[in-house]
């Protein structure tokens, strides 16, 4: 498991990285994570999140544009545990999570806006692997995202931690 330090990556690659507006908090069991972006665009329906975490996620980060909704959670303990089991590096969720006491013990990175106890509807609605924009940054499938307790950054290509 690679450890990333976003300030060091920003210093080493100032012309390459974009920094998200500071609105995310770390809810996962991994303080730092990074990988290739897979995107979902949805609103108060985590059906596509459930589908993706059931797939192999080695080297990948699921970026979920939940429209910034603070009315329900797009990720809970069961989906986080599936993501960890299937090798996902982490999830960046522009929305809420729940079961936070379990998430912090799960071996997957999770950055989200807040916690909320209500689950989503399951209507099968959402778009996979489309460009999504939130927190002042556009996430494109196949690009790279890195996160730690300092923040979240995006790069068009993979980054190596400086020595």
UniProtKB/Swiss-Prot annotation:
Can you supply a Gene Ontology BP term from the record?
Answer: regulation of RNA metabolic process
Give the matching SUPFAM superfamilies: RraA-like
Q: Which cofactor does it need?
A: a divalent metal cation
Report whether Glycosyltransferase shows up as a keyword of the record: no
Q: How is the cofactor bound?
A: Divalent metal cation.
Per the UniProt record, which EC number(s) apply here? 4.1.3.17, 4.1.1.112
State the signal peptide span: none
> Record-annotated residues binding a divalent metal cation?
99
Ordered alphabetically, the record's keywords are: Lyase, Metal-binding
Q: Where does substrate bind?
A: 76-79, 98
Q: Which GO terms describe its molecular function?
A: 4-hydroxy-4-methyl-2-oxoglutarate aldolase activity; metal ion binding; oxaloacetate decarboxylase activity; ribonuclease inhibitor activity
Q: What class of enzyme is it?
A: lyase
So what does this thing catalyse?
4-hydroxy-4-methyl-2-oxoglutarate = 2 pyruvate; oxaloacetate + H(+) = pyruvate + CO2
Q: What does the sequence similarity comment in the record state about its family?
A: Belongs to the class II aldolase/RraA-like family.
| Role | Catalyzes the aldol cleavage of 4-hydroxy-4-methyl-2-oxoglutarate (HMG) into 2 molecules of pyruvate. Also contains a secondary oxaloacetate (OAA) decarboxylase activity due to the common pyruvate enolate transition state formed following C-C bond cleavage in the retro-aldol and decarboxylation reactions.
Which PANTHER family has this protein been placed in?
4-HYDROXY-4-METHYL-2-OXOGLUTARATE ALDOLASE 3-RELATED, REGULATOR OF RIBONUCLEASE ACTIVITY A
Q: How does it assemble?
A: Homotrimer.
Q: What is this protein called?
A: Putative 4-hydroxy-4-methyl-2-oxoglutarate aldolase
Source species: Pseudomonas putida (strain W619)
